Amino acid sequence: MTHGPRPTLRIATYNVHRCRGLDGRTRPDRIAAVISAIDADVVALQEVVGAGPHGGGHAEELGAMLGMGWVMAPARQLRGHSFGNAVLSRFPIAQHLEHDLSWKTCEARRMQRVDIAADSQTLHLYNVHLGTAILERRHQAQKLASIVCDRHVPGPKLVVGDFNEWMRGLATNLLSEKLNSVDLRDYLRIFGRVLESAPPAEAAV
């Protein structure tokens, strides 16, 4: 009995910084152009402006522009809008759970667990944005590892996000003790080549 090649699932993580560029302009369409250029199936986003009194927010806009489903995990309010992490997916989202990673008086942080129904298997994707203080990150890394290692959640798991940490920092070392690390250097080189060949964002509007 022969089996065909295993399907490839392209996953990206992207801190969009409220969709604001270096020019100070808030342009979700430019974020959508980058995501479109890398042709990602699933994208974990951080620092996303969500729904507010006058609109549905950037996660909804990006989902509509890219034709992707989305879920958001607000951590706090920002000028009347929810603010936090979001996940975009071309595949059905089977389940969405949130975990509080906040520590003491530091900025509120939440983690998403998004179960992606990809072909015949479910991928458990964990989207995180760790804090900027070292003790805060240590607490969050320990809690994150405990959540991800829950044996009641079977199947493949992937932790992505903005760790606010060096590759060999305290938080990443703590996580590496419990989880397998993926060497991203080759993928980053590919990503750079894709962006170099992508059309200007202005032309992608």
Where are the regions that the model predicts?
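Membrane-embedded segments
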Residues: A51, G57-A59
